[in-house]
Amino acid sequence: MVEVRVPATSANIGPGFDCLGVAVNIYNKFFVEEVEEGIIFEGCADKFKNENNLIYVAMKKCFDKIGYKPTGLRIKIESDIPVSRGLGSSAACVVGGIVSANELAGGALNKKELLDLAVEVEGHPDNVNPAFCGGMTASISDNREVIYSKVKVSEGIKFCALIPDFTLSTEKARAVLPKSIDYKDGIFNVGRTALMISALNNGDFHLIKYACKDKLHQDYRAKLIENFYSIKKQCEKLNSLGVFLSGAGPTIMVMLREEDKDFSKNIKSFLETLKNKWEVRELKIDKLGTVVNNRKL
């Protein structure tokens, strides 16, 4: 049996639209083995127990590339990553499927080939890359090839995810974005993306609040998330380092100093006054990325 563990990811980190992403310590686990016939799913809802299951779709893509034909499959899922909340649940399924398929087929593809294949299936590298590699990454796609660099994050910072009880599909969140942008808005984001990477690298945490600002996606998507601005304002009052929409949302991600012991309790009290229910989870950066049979990919 092959066991694969994939971390949740938070993409964009404010201005780094479709390029920055970070892995955090929430995980999905996949247990896959070859059986005599059929496809057996365990640990997921009945509506996902078919060949359209994203994990199976990713596995088949890998098998087809390698030229491997399993007799049958048993796929067991232990999922802790919330679905459609902007925490990379689909990327985790794609990565888990491709990596487990490759392992079953004898490891025919190397890490680079697996990464390129996963981005081909998922569509964007910002979640897939940190899910594979761990840590924070800056990624681009160049002629279907994934190019990336690890972003060093200085010690002394942690994350806090504010996860609502409602979902937001990536398709809906994409649909509200404009077809084109002003030149000055592009410059605005380029500067703040560079500042974000530099501030995290050098430990200039006081600059993060400036670097989190964005003009390409967050304001458009905030309209789909009730109380986004009031929550953001409250986080800032509670001395957060920075606040941004995690991926396409609706999860709101907060950056904090490691020694901040009061934020989670205080923001939870505020969130309890709102209509929707919000879960508060303090998180650390996952530095390992995808783990296969207890070894780093």
From Swiss-Prot:
Entry's EC annotation: 2.7.1.39
Enzymatic class: transferase
Primary location recorded for the protein, binned into one broad class: cytoplasm
Cellular compartments annotated: Cytoplasm
One annotated Gene Ontology cellular component of this protein: cytoplasm
InterPro entries named in the record: GHMP_kinase_C_dom, GHMP_kinase_C_sf, GHMP_kinase_N_dom, GHMP_knse_ATP-bd_CS, Homoserine_kinase, Ribosomal_Su5_D2-typ_SF, Ribsml_uS5_D2-typ_fold_subgr
Cross-referenced Pfam families: GHMP_kinases_C, GHMP_kinases_N
GO BP: any one term: threonine biosynthetic process
Protein family: Belongs to the GHMP kinase family. Homoserine kinase subfamily.
HAMAP family in the record: Homoser_kinase
UniProt protein name: Homoserine kinase
Organism: Clostridium botulinum (strain Langeland / NCTC 10281 / Type F)
